[in-house]
């Protein structure tokens, strides 16, 4: 690519996009000053890495997008990389939102929620956790030990009698009972201590309270506290204190393995190791390690992420005079000899995969006083590069407080970096032992291994209660946290139209995008989905295939695994792929197909059962879906509605006396009241 006219490029923060001759974006970068950043690519070509040279050889034009602030540039870059997946960018494929625990502040009796987005409100957040299923198990354990309310605010406001959890002793029942606010607040404070990692402190306090209750002959209260302590001790066993002095930080480790680069990140809150995650990029080498580190930090922390005040990294890459966010990572800056030696040594040990944090400490020993950390001292000595400063500024704006990206400052943080590197190495080894993605790539003619696979299926009964189920597999394993259900209005049972409508809604939901989308159906379903994505401008964003079920002689679907008649279709290809019966890739695709089929039909059956009960209410003139939902939130069954009488029904918001009288007459006539025999009672279970 020829050097562009730099006078046309603004001196503002923003994003630059290299494009090839077809107009496709092949690289996205951010800059504090766009003109200086672009100019740095054409100063000394001999200093560029082969990857950067290849990118410039394929690039034909460069576009720039100015932003007002560095934070906007960071967010725009991450958004464009996720959307376009440029060929020469390092793309973080696993960009899902992790789960958090949240305790609200506005309600007089707040509940403990599991959320995926941290809002800037008065609520308290705890996390992050990578596994939603593990978080739900923790949530259940907490509720068994601490009787907090579980119902939504709307259900709380409409409830007239205590729920089942109250009768089980797992809820104080503030919706119907007078619960002192200080009693409930004390429970919330105990839960906060547990989620903050101060479990030992909480157990000691509860044990003291239990002994006091026992001495006061309140044995029932002492037994409750004893059970709570036992539940907590089982939970505490799973928590590991890794920073004796406490503190919130994320720790990143990078290591080069035989066939790529791996990165691990650990989440430490209040000195306790909460969780971690590892990633692997095949095909990357030693030269891309600096870019990988900066690119990961830029993409991993988004507007809804929980950003700690300190992010520990294994080394601080050299940067050029502008940003250092180019692919080459070359440096024109003057670096003191001692600092350069440490950086070069630590980066070299990324190549060998050895733990290097002790070397960093040995070369830059500094007293651990307050926030004057070793990493910060080193950054100050060398002069933080522009990418470093830009990331800190942008992340601080997102967090609403100071964020430091620095080297480990003590032996405890050194061990955490080593742990992150070890986890990353294990992740790379695990994926290297799983060649299934390579088999799929060859069989389906994909550009690369499909790390994320989404599969969809339509389920309905004569066009009613239509549900499209979507399941997700990552690296060959189900990822239930990402499963989704899409509901559609009743229609004529047009699967093609439903799939096309689903494609539009999938585009609206945004990334992460799959590497492969598998449709349960034949050529017709495949064509409908492909056409819909093309109309949304997503025609080439990812690969699409369909799997058509085999048929018996009677024409019914035959779902036997490995059936030779199962057919795989690709867009633009009339004939199915000639996959060998029993081949691992075919068996896997059949497993994915069966998973999405079972998931979709299960959601449809649940919707159909709920509609049957709600439909009974809507047979009464004047009662629509909204009123039916309000009634179900107040009552457990149709029989309970009949027993409530006109006054009880009229008390539900939005019902009114006239509709209450009509509904009561219908229910009593059809089902009878509680005094008229209970033959119908067993059939009228709670909705859904």
Swiss-Prot record:
It comes from the Bacteria. Gene3D superfamilies: 5' to 3' exonuclease, C-terminal subdomain, GIY-YIG endonuclease, UVR domain, UvrC, RNAse H endonuclease domain. Residues 11-90 form the GIY-YIG domain. Keywords: Cytoplasm, DNA damage, DNA excision, DNA repair, Excision nuclease, SOS response. Pfam families: GIY-YIG (PF01541), HHH_5 (PF14520), UVR (PF02151), UvrC_RNaseH (PF22920), UvrC_RNaseH_dom (PF08459). GO terms for biological process: nucleotide-excision repair; SOS response. This is UvrABC system protein C. It comes from Nitratidesulfovibrio vulgaris (strain ATCC 29579 / DSM 644 / CCUG 34227 / NCIMB 8303 / VKM B-1760 / Hildenborough) (Desulfovibrio vulgaris). The lineage of its organism: Bacteria, Pseudomonadati, Thermodesulfobacteriota, Desulfovibrionia, Desulfovibrionales. The gene is uvrC.
């Amino acid at each position: 690519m020829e050097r562009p006219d730099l006078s046309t490029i603004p001196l503002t923060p923003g994003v630059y996009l290299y494009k090839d001759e077809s107009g496709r974006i092949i690289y996205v970068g951010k800059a504090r000053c766009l003109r200086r950043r672009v100019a740095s690519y054409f100063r000394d070509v001999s200093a560029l890495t082969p990857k950067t040279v290849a990118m410039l050889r394929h690039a034909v034009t460069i576009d720039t997008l100015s932003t007002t602030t560095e934070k906007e540039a960071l967010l725009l870059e991450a958004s464009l990389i996720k959307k376009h997946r440029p060929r020469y960018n390092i793309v973080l494929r696993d960009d899902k939102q992790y789960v958090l625990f949240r305790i609200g502040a506005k309600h007089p009796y707040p509940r403990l929620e599991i959320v995926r987005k941290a809002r800037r409100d008065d609520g308290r957040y705890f996390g992050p956790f990578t596994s939603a299923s593990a978080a739900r198990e923790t949530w259940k354990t907490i509720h068994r030990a601490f009787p907090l309310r579980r119902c939504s605010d709307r259900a709380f406001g409409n409830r007239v009698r205590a729920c089942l959890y109250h009768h089980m002793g797992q809820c104080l029942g503030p919706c119907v009972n007078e619960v002192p606010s200080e009693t409930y607040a004390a429970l919330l404070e105990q839960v906060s201590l547990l989620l903050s990692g101060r479990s030992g402190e909480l157990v000691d306090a509860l044990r003291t309270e239990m002994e006091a209750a026992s001495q006061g002959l309140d044995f029932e209260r002492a037994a409750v506290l004893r059970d709570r302590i036992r539940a907590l001790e089982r939970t505490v066993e799973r928590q590991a204190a890794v920073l004796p002095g406490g503190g919130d930080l994320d720790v990143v480790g990078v290591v080069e393995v035989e066939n790529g680069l791996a990165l691990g990140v650990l989440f430490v809150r209040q000195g306790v190791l909460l969780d971690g995650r590892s990633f692997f990029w095949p095909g990357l080498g030693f030269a891309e390690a600096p870019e990988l580190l900066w690119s990961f930090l830029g993409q991993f922390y988004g507007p809804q992420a929980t950003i700690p005040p300190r992010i520990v990294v294994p080394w601080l890459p050299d940067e050029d005079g502008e940003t250092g966010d180019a692919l080459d990572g070359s440096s024109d800056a003057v670096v003191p000899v001692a600092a350069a030696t440490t950086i070069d040594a630590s980066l070299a040990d990324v190549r060998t995969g050895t733990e290097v944090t002790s070397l960093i400490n040995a070369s830059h020993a500094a007293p651990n006083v307050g926030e004057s950390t070793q990493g910060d001292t080193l950054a100050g000595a060398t002069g933080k590069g522009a990418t470093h400063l830009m990331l800190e500024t942008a992340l601080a704006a997102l967090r609403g407080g100071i964020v430091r990206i620095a080297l480990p400052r003590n032996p405890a943080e050194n061990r955490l970096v080593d742990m992150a590197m070890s986890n990353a190495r294990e992740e790379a080894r695990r994926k290297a032992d799983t060649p299934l993605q390579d088999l799929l790539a060859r069989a389906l003619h994909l550009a690369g291994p499909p790390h994320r696979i989404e599969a969809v299926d339509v389920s309905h009964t004569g066009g009613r209660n239509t549900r499209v189920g979507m399941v997700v597999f990552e690296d060959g394993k189900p990822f239930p946290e990402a499963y989704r259900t899409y509901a559609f209005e009743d229609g004529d049972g047009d699967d093609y139209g439903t799939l096309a409508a689903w494609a539009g809604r999938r585009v609206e939901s945004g990334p992460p995008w799959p590497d492969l989308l598998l449709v349960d159906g034949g050529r017709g379903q495949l064509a409908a989905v492909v056409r819909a994505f093309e109309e949304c401008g997503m025609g080439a964003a990812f690969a699409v295939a369909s799997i058509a079920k085999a048929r018996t002689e009677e024409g019914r679907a035959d779902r036997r695994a490995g059936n030779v008649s199962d057919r795989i279709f690709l867009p633009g290809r009339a004939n199915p792929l000639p996959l060998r019966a029993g081949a691992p890739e075919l068996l896997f695709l059949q497993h994915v197909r069966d998973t999405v089929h079972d998931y979709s039909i299960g959601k449809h059956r649940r919707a159909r059962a709920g509609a049957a009960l709600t439909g009974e209410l809507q047979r009464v003139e004047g009662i629509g879906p909204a009123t039916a939902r309000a009634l179900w939130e107040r009552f457990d069954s149709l029989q309970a509605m009949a027993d409530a009488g006109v006054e009880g029904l009229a008390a539900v918001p939005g019902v009114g006396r006239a509709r209450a009288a009509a509904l009561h007459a219908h229910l009593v006539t059809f089902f009878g009241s509680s005094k008229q025999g209970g033959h119908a009672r067993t059939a009228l279970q709670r909705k859904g």
